[in-house]
Amino acid sequence: MPRRLDVLDAPVRLTHDGGELLARAGEPLLLSLLVGKGFVLSRSPKLHRPRGPYCLRGACEGCLVRVDGVPNLMACQTLAAEGQKVETQNVIGSRKLDVLEATDYLFPRGMDHHRLFAGVRGVSALVQAFARRVSGLGRLADHAEPPREAKRLEIDVLVVGGGTAGLSAAAELGARGLLADDQLALGGALRVLDPPRAEALVRRARASGCKLRPRTSVIGLYVEDRERALTALLVGPEGAISVSARRVVLAPGSHDPVPLFENNDLPGVMSARAALSLLRQGVLVGERVAVVGDGRFAAHFVEASSELATSTLLDSEMVLSAHGKPSVSSVKVRAGSIERRLRVDAVIVDGPAPPAFELGVQAGGTTRFVPERGYLLELDAERRVAPHVFAAGSAAGSSDSEEDGKGAARVALASL
């Protein structure tokens, strides 16, 4: 079970399913949930399999909870505060013992709810009514939030992504740029790999005069007038913002790799980047950790936790399956013709990270497949993905994100 490595000073008190938890004000709510309740935080919509956090970046559904009557909030992106009421969603029973988990055993090959008992007189209507009651995630909010009018901004250059490439681009753009990133803090991968360097990049970008907006997702990039500007839809703490940008620099980074073994969705299986992020924030995922695959995040985790946990390094091809109820407690591995089980508290996964190409494609760009990397955005000689849209960093296949970000910003400015 995850545990804290430090003592909470002046903690805030909140409740989770009626039980009291202690947290540090302003930290991600997920930390106190993991330490106080373990890895299982919710259930999947259809088969009600146990769910836990995988990425800690708001990109998976493993930490969705109801907070103060508001459904489907990501605990990794929600800040802990005094008096919060946190509730588990999508269970009949409890997080660890959900009655509807039986569907996972009754339908081992999956359930086609569209045809289940279809046409059976007297039964079909009952099944449909029940399915509608238990489907979906969460219940409507206790109180509807009044609508807020979207703000509108016009800028020269919008930078998407607050990692090394994005911050480097922002520093070049200065007051002519606006940077949006969906994380609680700027810095991207450097935030966990090299925190001091991440802080230095943030300070440099802020000193340049560039407007920095953490906790702000760019959820759409629309080509409405190729001769003048693109429209980006941003969503953050202030609500929706419609941004008209003459140029866009995409630096969204990469997604966490997905492990390819049976039961890879068990709570306690997470990315090495997520485990390292927890460690940087004072939470250890477990005393016995299986490290599957290799990469920067796995290497840093093993080094940083060497005196706190026992790490077992495994090639990704060795791992056959994860086991445990309701969270992972062992992995089955194969070396040659020999299979055995290893007892673990957590499984962390690293490896080639899939580039985040989605916004580039939405803006009209194309991708190319590189076997060892995945689908990368296709660039021309000036880093252009589509008219008025440039890309930098790992999404573009760069090996030097800092210089790549600077270069993309310079080209974007020169094209105005």
Located regions from the model:
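Residues forming the flavin
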Residues: 2-12, 25-74, 79-416
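Short, contiguous acidic and Ser/Thr-rich linear segments
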Residues: 17-27
